[in-house]
A protein has these predicted regions:
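Boundary at the C-terminal end of the N-terminal hydrophobic targeting segment
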Residues: 58-63
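Glycine-rich, flexible N-terminal cofactor/catalytic loop recognition
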Residues: 100-110, 115-120
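Short glycine-enriched loops at secondary-structure junctions
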Residues: 114-119, 139-142, 168, 180
Length: 254
């Protein structure tokens, strides 16, 4: 079940070669860990802000059980600010170690319902690494019964504390719904899910995209007793967001 959902995000991280011996590398990692701990105790883990930009600093692994829904959302938004500013840190982590740590289990602190658009690489957009984001993707970021079931699994079985429904600039699914053109195959099956947003916002594409994200977020809260129950118990936050593919920035809509 832990592989119920494949994020379909291809993260390419270049790794530089090193001639350092195994013993020297181990010592370096231990020393680096001590330095990070000292930085954390001094309050440096949140990062430095210089000239309005968040400077990339090493971050510790997230302790899911210690995060509140608000803190989980703040972590995602802080990651997006790093990404938009060109200071991403997720790819600096030891990916081999992360793969090993998540081999038998996953404990993502967040979930994102995103469009299938290739220009919206969710983990990169929020500067998160392996095992931190439970991602459901479908054209138009719509809350179908299958998507709701997947997100319920994230909440009930994995303990995610925040769900972000992420619309994005120039969404083709919303544009196609506005135009109402006949499409081959089952593409037009998306339209009924997006039509309420178009009816609400009119032909303005950007307005319809934002309305759609908010409507789908509301649907998650209303259609799922698992999700609504977690929200009522203050264990979960469900919000809508808008990703500008030009700037790289995410704006919360609620």
């Amino acid at each position: 079940m832990t592989s119920l959902l494949d994020s379909r995000v291809s993260t390419r991280c270049s790794q530089s070669s090193s001639a350092t011996s195994g013993a020297e590398m181990c010592a370096w990692k231990q020393d680096s860990s001590r330095r990070r701990f000292i930085q954390l105790t001094m309050g440096a883990a949140a990062g430095l802000v210089t000239g309005g930009l968040e400077v990339a600093t090493p971050r510790p692994a997230l302790a899911q059980s210690k995060l509140s829904p608000d803190a989980a959302l703040q972590e995602l938004m802080a990651g997006n600010r790093r990404f938009a500013a060109g200071h991403s840190t997720a790819c600096e982590k030891d990916l081999a170690t992360l793969r090993k740590a998540t081999e038998e289990k996953q404990e993502p602190f967040s979930a994102v319902l995103a469009c299938a658009d290739s220009r919206v690489p969710v983990e990169l957009v929020f500067d998160q690494s392996i095992g931190q984001v439970f991602v459901a993707r479908i054209a138009g970021n719509i809350a179908t019964s299958e998507i709701i079931a997947s997100l319920e699994y994230g909440v009930a079985a994995l303990g995610t504390q925040v769900i972000v429904v992420l619309g994005h600039r120039n969404c083709g699914a919303v544009k196609a719904t506005i135009e109402g053109k006949g499409e081959p195959g089952q593409i037009s099956a998306l339209y009924p899910h997006i039509r309420p947003a178009v009816d609400q916002a009119g032909p303005n594409l950007d307005a319809a995209i934002k309305a759609n994200a908010k409507i789908q977020a509301a649907l998650l809260r209303q259609a799922s007793t698992v999700i609504s129950g977690a929200v009522k118990e203050s264990k979960l936050k469900v919000v809508a967001g808008y990703y500008d593919i030009a700037s790289g920035s995410v704006t919360l809509l609620e």
